[in-house]
Swiss-Prot record:
It comes from Finegoldia magna (strain ATCC 29328 / DSM 20472 / WAL 2508) (Peptostreptococcus magnus). GO terms for molecular function: RNA binding; tRNA pseudouridine(38-40) synthase activity. The gene is truA. Belongs to the tRNA pseudouridine synthase TruA family. This is tRNA pseudouridine synthase A. Keywords: Isomerase, tRNA processing.
């Protein structure tokens, strides 16, 4: 038996997310079909992060266990051959059998790119978020300082399941102004569903002047989804890296 780890990049605008959803286009389904063609047996792919529809990845990781003589390098070439141009396998490795892409992960890093000028070039529509109004960068930094650390993020998750612990520790948040873009980077051991997008949406509300810093503090304390901001569009979100 072999445990193969793949590092994957994909254009999320072409898929209904990472996870299989009936017969709708998904990254997981396409990779599973590609591997199945190579090994001639059903294969289950485990993903490190379940990115939503429209969310991209530069460093997604998945693994699968299979009885085969095919080498890791052959899987790199073969999966790239059988998948569409919207998916690229950039690395393939054979791991110990106890390795799991999701449960072995030590941290995940997401990036959100927000174009902040009056208009955005149309070819960026699927690859950046967009806000045309002025955003106060100093207020964004104050939001950042409040959100770093261990908190109950119930207010910043959609469809929280009863058995999921909403407490998470954000290790790092960086915010950079790069030309006309504001780039948010979040690093944590794990994230809740839509957590990064809701955090960015809430921070933007404060930076725009619609909400106050105290409002954001209360949103954390209230543990109620209605207390926080919107779920910003998925187009600007990228899963950048998984550390093990």
């Amino acid at each position: 038996m072999k445990n193969i780890k793949l590092t994957v990049q994909y254009d999320g605008s072409k898929f209904y997310g990472w996870q299989k959803l009936n017969d709708l286009p998904s990254v997981q389904l396409e990779i599973e079909k590609a591997v199945t063609k190579m090994v001639h047996q059903p294969v289950k792919i485990n993903g490190a992060g379940r990115t939503d529809k429209g969310v991209h990845a530069k460093g997604q990781v998945c693994n699968f266990i299979v009885d085969t003589d095919i080498s890791a390098n052959q899987f790199l070439m073969g999966v790239n051959h059988f998948t569409s141009d919207s998916i690229v396998i950039v690395k393939s490795e054979e791991m110990d059998l106890d390795f799991h892409a999701r449960f072995s992960a030590k941290s995940k890093t997401y990036k959100y790119i927000l174009c902040n000028k009056y208009y955005m070039e149309p070819w960026f529509n699927d690859y950046k978020g967009h806000r045309k109004y002025y955003l106060d960068f100093d207020l964004l930094l104050k939001c950042r300082d409040m959100l770093i650390g261990k908190h109950d993020f119930t207010s910043f998750v959609n469809d929280l399941e009863e058995d999921i612990n909403p407490v998470r520790t954000i290790d790092e948040i960086t915010i950079e102004k790069i030309d006309d873009d504001i780039v948010f980077t979040f690093k944590a051991e794990s994230f809740l569903r839509n957590m990064v997008r809701i955090l960015v949406g809430s921070m933007v509300d404060v930076a725009r002047g619609r909400k106050s810093i105290d409002w954001l503090k209360n949103a954390l304390e209230n543990k109620d989804r209605q207390s926080a901001g919107i779920t910003i569009e998925p187009s600007g979100l990228y899963l950048m890296d998984i550390e093990y």
